[in-house]
């Protein structure tokens, strides 16, 4: 049985905070625990959306989300191709369901959000990052001979256009610090501390109740 890696908290205003917190590791990664937990969380959001006003996604770890589970990926071979494809498609379906929930969804980025971590944030309608030491965002998959598989290609192209997305984000594998990430549009807002993140995210939801796809 997979460990639950996402804590659910709903406040009096109907805002649900999903806190990524994998009990099996020091960082959140896109392992089987995450995949099942995110699927269950999204199903619950859809089922209860009439009583929900918005969603905040944040992390209890020092990093927001470290990306793919490299330990599992390194063991993949041709015989696992079908299974790997199905897994990636399931991840994309859940993020798309989150994106099209019909409620504003905000990523409250408290630490590094790389690869799959940034892809989770890109599925949100607003991204707030703490301007703190060590926080970087990016899609570094190309440095491993890979491309983002969780919707990052589609969403960056939609946000920035094909040439800009490819040349400046996808093909370089650059890790952007908070100020640069905001400058280029990967994040929308900066706050001065991690403690300010969730309150800022909730304030944005209240001010933008119709900010959803």
Predicted regions and their residues:
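Amphipathic alpha-helical segments at domain termini/boundaries
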Residues: 1-21, 26, 122, 164-213
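Conserved CoA-thioester-binding segment of acyl-CoA-metabolizing enzymes
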Residues: 1-58, 82, 93-96
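Glycine- (often His-adjacent) and acidic-residue-rich active-site loop
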Residues: 48-51, 59-93, 113, 143-145
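Glycine-rich beta-to-alpha active-site loop
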Residues: 97-144
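Gly/Pro- and small hydrophobic-enriched strand-loop and loop-to-helix capping segments
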Residues: 124-149, 185-201
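Hydrophobic, secondary-structure "cap" segments at the distal end of domains
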Residues: 153-164
């Amino acid at each position: 049985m997979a460990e639950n890696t996402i804590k659910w908290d709903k406040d009096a205003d109907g805002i649900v905070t999903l806190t990524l917190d994998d009990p099996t590791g020091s960082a959140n990664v896109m392992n089987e625990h995450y995949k099942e937990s995110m699927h269950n969380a999204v199903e619950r959001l859809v089922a209860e959306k009439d009583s929900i006003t918005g969603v905040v996604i944040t992390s209890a770890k020092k990093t927001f989300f470290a990306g793919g589970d490299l330990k599992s990926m390194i063991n993949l071979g041709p015989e696992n191709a079908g299974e790997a494809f199905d897994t990636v498609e399931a991840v994309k379906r859940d993020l798309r369901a989150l994106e099209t929930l019909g409620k504003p969804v905000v990523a409250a980025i408290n630490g590094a959000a790389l690869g799959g971590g940034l892809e989770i944030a890109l599925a949100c309608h607003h991204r707030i990052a703490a301007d703190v030491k060590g926080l970087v965002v990016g899609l570094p998959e190309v440095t491993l001979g890979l491309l983002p598989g969780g919707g990052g290609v589609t969403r960056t192209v939609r946000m920035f256009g094909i040439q800009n997305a490819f040349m400046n984000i996808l093909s370089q594998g650059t890790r952007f610090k908070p100020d640069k990430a905001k400058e280029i549009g990967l994040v929308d807002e900066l706050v001065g501390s991690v403690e300010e993140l969730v309150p800022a995210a909730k304030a944005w939801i209240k001010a933008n109740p119709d900010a959803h796809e």
